[in-house]
From Swiss-Prot:
Any GO MF annotation of the entry: S-methyl-5-thioribose-1-phosphate isomerase activity
Catalytic activity, as annotated: 5-(methylsulfanyl)-alpha-D-ribose 1-phosphate = 5-(methylsulfanyl)-D-ribulose 1-phosphate
Biological processes per GO annotation: L-methionine salvage from methylthioadenosine
Physiological role: Catalyzes the interconversion of methylthioribose-1-phosphate (MTR-1-P) into methylthioribulose-1-phosphate (MTRu-1-P).
Protein name per its UniProtKB record: Methylthioribose-1-phosphate isomerase
Entries under InterPro entries matching the protein: IF-2B-related, IF-M1Pi, IF_2B-like_C, Initiation_fac_2B_a/b/d, M1Pi_N, NagB/RpiA_transferase-like
Annotated pathway: Amino-acid biosynthesis; L-methionine biosynthesis via salvage pathway; L-methionine from S-methyl-5-thio-alpha-D-ribose 1-phosphate: step 1/6
Primary site of residence: cytoplasm
Length: 364
């Protein structure tokens, strides 16, 4: 059974504190937007899909109690709070897309004189709740389609060995996962022989989170340090690399956790197919190529300390961008809920992501 990183019922939201994993399992109450911003910014919840869901649900929780606000006041409050939530972590595109669509929904509901303030709030909150359901459904589709694409390139019924980086499972999404969802689907077919996961310095999402999920689900796996990828591919047959994405540009360039780019280079050298698994909400058609993606920089302390213990020499300068950008030329395929696309064919999914709502949340 997959881990439950988000617990939500109308008016109540709890998230699993990922900073405490794997040693402690503790849920944090999110009582509103301020709490939502903090848990996203502090990386107590992380992963582009999960950031979007938790941010929007924090607004739903804040709006749930009875109040006498007019439609106009609610609309203004919604826009301000959603824009504030987007600022918590700027690289992940999903929360920006969700915020834009919810603001559009609020504007539409506010302009309709036949809709009361009570119905406005009910429909708005209901639309956010629909996002939670859709995210899980989309992740399962990504898992199935990615599994199928990888097995097509494997001779006969040979067992499959894969490598993944960072964390892209139930802890990074509303449930099931993107790249780790593909791995779950491979495991369900009984074709998965082994998963290798990187520790993912400096925040150790692979060691703390991915390894935790793999052990929890009894998926055969091995943890390795980030600098071992070349040796792994040289000495052992790896059939595919599967990673997630925080933002994909229109040409297929992909921003993902720092270290992804160098893994893609090594995979190319060793003729290992490199796949990106991401929902359509992670594709940003407004950005023509990856150099336009804004890269978040994290505090030095995340590099110099583990917990309260300093591991780096005092006085050393640090450079700690959270993401790098993998060029589309290194990517074999981008796995979405609508299919697996070569990066130069992303324009064929434009109908799904342009002129149409990513989250399909407009319900008037």
């Amino acid at each position: 059974m997959s881990l439950e990183s988000i617990k939500y019922t109308r008016g109540s939201l709890e998230i699993l504190d990922q900073l405490l994993l794997p040693l402690q399992t503790r849920y944090i109450k999110v009582r509103g937007v301020e709490d939502g911003w903090k848990v996203i910014n502090k990386m107590q919840v992380r992963g582009a899909p999960a950031i979007a869901i938790v941010g929007c649900l924090s607004l739903a929780v804040e709006l749930s109690p009875d109040n006498e606000s007019s439609k106009k006041n609610m609309r203004q409050e919604i826009e301000g709070k959603l824009n504030y939530l987007v600022s918590a972590r700027p690289t992940a595109v999903n929360i920006k897309l969700a915020a834009d669509e919810l603001i559009n929904l609020a504007n539409t509901l506010c302009a309709d004189d036949s809709i009361s303030a009570e119905i406005f709030k009910e429909r708005f909150i209901g639309s956010i709740e629909d996002m939670l359901t859709k995210d899980i459904h989309d992740n399962k589709a990504i898992g199935s389609l990615g599994c199928e694409a990888i097995l097509k390139n494997i001779d006969g019924d040979s067992p499959v060995r894969v490598l993944t980086h960072c964390n892209t499972g139930s802890l990074a999404t509303a449930g099931y996962g993107t790249a780790l969802g593909v791995i779950r689907s491979l495991h369900a077919t009984k074709r998965l022989e082994h998963v290798f996961c990187t520790e993912t310095r400096p925040y150790n999402q692979g060691a703390r989170l991915t390894a935790y999920e793999l052990v929890h689900e009894k998926i055969p796996s091995t943890l390795m340090v980030d600098s071992m990828v070349s040796a792994l591919m040289h000495t052992r047959k790896i059939h595919a690399v599967i990673v997630g994405a925080d933002r994909v540009a229109a040409n297929g360039d992909t921003a993902n956790k720092m270290g992804t780019y160098q893994i893609a280079i090594v995979a190319k050298y060793h003729d290992v197919p490199f796949y990106v698994a991401a929902p359509l909400t992670s594709i940003d058609m407004s950005l023509p190529y990856g150099e336009k993606i804004k890269i978040e920089e994290r505090p030095d302390r995340e590099m110099t300390h583990i917990g309260e213990h300093r591991i780096a020499a005092p006085g050393i300068n640090c450079w700690n961008p959270s993401f790098d950008v993998t060029p589309a030329s290194l990517i074999a395929g981008i796995i979405t809920e609508k299919g697996v696309f070569a990066p130069d064919h992303l324009k064929s999914v434009k109908x799904h992501v342009t002129g149409k709502k990513y989250y399909n949340i407009i319900h008037i």
